[in-house]
Amino acid sequence: MPRKGHIAKRDVLPDPVYNSKVVTKFINSIMEDGKKGVAQKICYEAFELIAQRSGKEALEVFEEAMNNVMPLLEVKARRIGGATYQVPMEVRTERRQTLGIRWMLIAARKRGEKLMCERVAGELLDASNNTGAAVKKREDTHKMAEANKAFAHYRY
């Protein structure tokens, strides 16, 4: 535990184009080696591709995709009397968002398209249609939680 008390969580500023904090977090997660300009370019180009391919507004598709990827339950290892149990837990809102973004980008990076903006656009479109690797990751997490429902009383 920290000796100097609780550290306040820094708030992110909304992005300049869509005025959304979630988009800013998404851009920050895309960013590598502090190159925010490159990350913004990738994100906004992906959003343009989404608007062209789907015919819907890009932010709408993005929010729908995020809702389809963010997990409601996860399992945490808890050691009780020499045995380790996978205990299902509800996921806090902040962590839901973080996991959703992380899974989305991991799935996008594994895709086969040549450009990163195309990969991100493809994964977001798939996720908005409830398909794709990121949605599968969420379903697997929920299945794990469901399978270990018997240990739910070990919650802490």
From Swiss-Prot:
One CC-aspect GO term: small ribosomal subunit
SUPFAM superfamilies tied to this protein: Ribosomal protein S7 (SSF47973)
Name used for this protein in its record: Small ribosomal subunit protein uS7
Pfam families documented for this protein: Ribosomal_S7
HAMAP family: Ribosomal_uS7_B
GO biological process per UniProt: translation
Function: One of the primary rRNA binding proteins, it binds directly to 16S rRNA where it nucleates assembly of the head domain of the 30S subunit. Is located at the subunit interface close to the decoding center, probably blocks exit of the E-site tRNA.
InterPro entries recorded: Ribosomal_uS7 (IPR000235), Ribosomal_uS7_bac/org-type (IPR005717), Ribosomal_uS7_CS (IPR020606), Ribosomal_uS7_dom (IPR023798), Ribosomal_uS7_dom_sf (IPR036823)
This protein's record includes keyword Disulfide bond: no
PROSITE patterns per the UniProt record, alphabetical: RIBOSOMAL_S7
Encoding gene per record: rpsG
Disulphide-bridged cysteine pairs: none
GO MF term set: rRNA binding; structural constituent of ribosome; tRNA binding
Keywords per UniProt: Ribonucleoprotein, Ribosomal protein, RNA-binding, rRNA-binding, tRNA-binding
The family this protein is said to belong to: Belongs to the universal ribosomal protein uS7 family.
CDD domains in the record: uS7_Bacteria
Subunit structure: Part of the 30S ribosomal subunit. Contacts proteins S9 and S11.
